[in-house]
Amino acid sequence: LSDHPRLIEASKKMMDRRGFGMSSVRFICGTQDVHKELEAAISDYFKTDDTILYAACFDANGGVFEPLFTDQDAIISDSLNHASIIDGVRLCKAKRYRYANADMADLERCLKEAQAQRFRIICTDGVFSMDGNVAPIDKICDLAEKYDALVMVDESHSAGVVGATGHGVSELCKTYGRVDIYTGTLGKAFGGALGGFTTGRKEIIDMLRQRSRPYLFSNSLAPCIIGASLEV
């Protein structure tokens, strides 16, 4: 889509209207109505409460764990998750568990071992970037509910691709309302330039707006990128 004439034209028009860049982080003078419009559109797409934009999905995954979890908590991560999730987990003091790729028996083992922790979150790619297999999100959600865990899905390689209407693994596996956090990119199916996002429950997004360092200390997305992504 990055070469599609409609996206190129939408990007040009937005640059003419809003300038080349924002020259600031979001909370100073880096927020325009179009940023909020795109956040609302992403929330509607994933059927979530709210969304926060990042400069890249690497930042979204890098900035999601540390604000939410402490050394009293547990992060349970698929062994083939993207490097950005791996690095994000490393930045957090939570106890770490890793289960074999899409192996529900091994995931359940990790969940049992993590029962002493305060909060537990299961993290997985929706579609794994190297092998292309789809995570069994419905089964993951079943285990999360059984063992009182949160669920986070990175939809970077699945949104716009899988599902009856391209709405990602939650559409494919019918798990809307069961996933607590989604992350994703604007650099693939949603325009092909750059940019990332985290979308999910309102209280989680509110916390990230206050404490997620890649959001707080990175310049806001340029209007031309917003314009093209809105056109998608």
Per-region residue spans from a language model:
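Short, small-residue-enriched loops and turns at beta-alpha junctions
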Residues: 1, 28-32, 83, 105, ...
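Conserved N-terminal alpha-helix of the aminotransferase class I/II PLP-enzyme fold
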Residues: 6-57
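Conserved PLP-anchoring active-site segment centered on the Schiff-base-forming lysine
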Residues: 64-83
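Short, structured coil segments at secondary-structure junctions
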Residues: 71, 91-93, 147, 178
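Active-site phosphate-binding strand-loop segment of PLP-dependent enzymes
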Residues: 97, 101-153
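Active-site PLP attachment segment
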Residues: 165, 171-207
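PLP-dependent aminotransferase class I/II
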Residues: 190-232
